[in-house]
From Swiss-Prot:
This is Large ribosomal subunit protein uL14. Pfam families: Ribosomal_L14. NCBIfam families: rplN_bact. One of its GO terms (biological process) is translation. InterPro entries: Ribosomal_uL14, Ribosomal_uL14_bac-type, Ribosomal_uL14_CS, Ribosomal_uL14_sf. The gene is rplN. Part of the 50S ribosomal subunit. Forms a cluster with proteins L3 and L19. In the 70S ribosome, L14 and L19 interact and together make contacts with the 16S rRNA in bridges B5 and B8. Keywords: Ribonucleoprotein, Ribosomal protein, RNA-binding, rRNA-binding. Binds to 23S rRNA. Forms part of two intersubunit bridges in the 70S ribosome.
Length: 122
């Protein structure tokens, strides 16, 4: 469950380390984002010679949440941290590698690239 001002780890090699959610996309009254939702983020911490700089604003997709995601069979998949993958304006991943597991909920046509790059899909 991600809302405005939430700090997330970055799960790709785009050069950002931590980002802050500045908007949950998908309607003016939308308050929370979960796994698979697109959010607008600001880079708060970046590696020195990375692709992105501190202060840059990007779209991102949430790939892990500490709140977890409930499956239709009743299983609850939780993670230790909140993490996102940065996207460009065409909603393609900025990085070329994904770190850590991602959930099966990302297996939509839009995010198949992220699922294929991930080392583990839960």
């Amino acid at each position: 469950m991600i809302q405005m001002q939430t700090i997330l780890d970055v799960a790709d090699n785009s050069g950002a380390r931590r980002v802050m959610c500045i908007k949950v996309l998908g309607g003016s009254k939308r308050r929370y984002a979960s796994v698979g939702d697109i959010i607008k983020v600001a880079v708060k911490d970046a590696v020195p010679r990375g692709r992105v700089k501190k202060g840059d604003v990007y779209n991102a997709v949430v790939v892990r949440t500490a709140k977890g995601v409930r499956r239709p069979d009743g299983a609850l998949i939780k993670f230790d941290n909140n993490a996102a993958v940065l996207l460009n304006n065409k909603l393609e991943p900025l990085g070329t590698r994904i770190f850590g597991p991602v959930t099966r909920e990302l297996r939509t046509e839009r995010f198949m690239k992220i699922v294929s790059l991930a080392p583990e899909v839960l």
